[in-house]
Amino acid sequence: MARIAGIDIPREKRVEIALTYVYGIGLTRSKLILANTGVNPDTRVKDLSDGDVQKLRGATEEFTLEGDLRRKEGMALKRLQDIGCVRGRRHRMSLPVRGQRTRTNARTRRGSRKTVAGRKK
């Protein structure tokens, strides 16, 4: 397995797809990296030469990936919560942040239903 950005990428997959196993690299960024390095996207990871792997490592170093990216995103959310803005409060309460309705739906964000006892008449 080739290690890129501290992640072992799968040997049997095409390089274009295997790079997406690194947090912070999607398909678009993967294609950009391969175009810049001149590596064929259809090559399997196991068939890459050491030189190709070194090129890919060098190209990925210019991006914020893995732990640094997770930390950066976490700090952005923490900042929103600390300043007390609406988005931060919604994150803290585990509610949808971008204006979606919550009277019905929003089950993914709010979690499973909590049963409330009905009133007798």
UniProtKB/Swiss-Prot annotation:
Organism for this UniProt entry: Prochlorococcus marinus (strain AS9601)
SUPFAM superfamilies, per database record: S13-like H2TH domain
UniProt-recorded name of the protein: Small ribosomal subunit protein uS13
Biased composition (Basic residues): 100-121
Any single Gene Ontology cellular-component annotation: small ribosomal subunit
Record has Transport as a keyword: no
Family designation: Belongs to the universal ribosomal protein uS13 family.
Chain segments annotated as transmembrane: none
Pfam families per record: Ribosomal_S13
Source superkingdom: Bacteria
Function as written in the Swiss-Prot or TrEMBL entry: Located at the top of the head of the 30S subunit, it contacts several helices of the 16S rRNA. In the 70S ribosome it contacts the 23S rRNA (bridge B1a) and protein L5 of the 50S subunit (bridge B1b), connecting the 2 subunits; these bridges are implicated in subunit movement. Contacts the tRNAs in the A and P-sites.
Keywords attached to this entry: Ribonucleoprotein, Ribosomal protein, RNA-binding, rRNA-binding, tRNA-binding
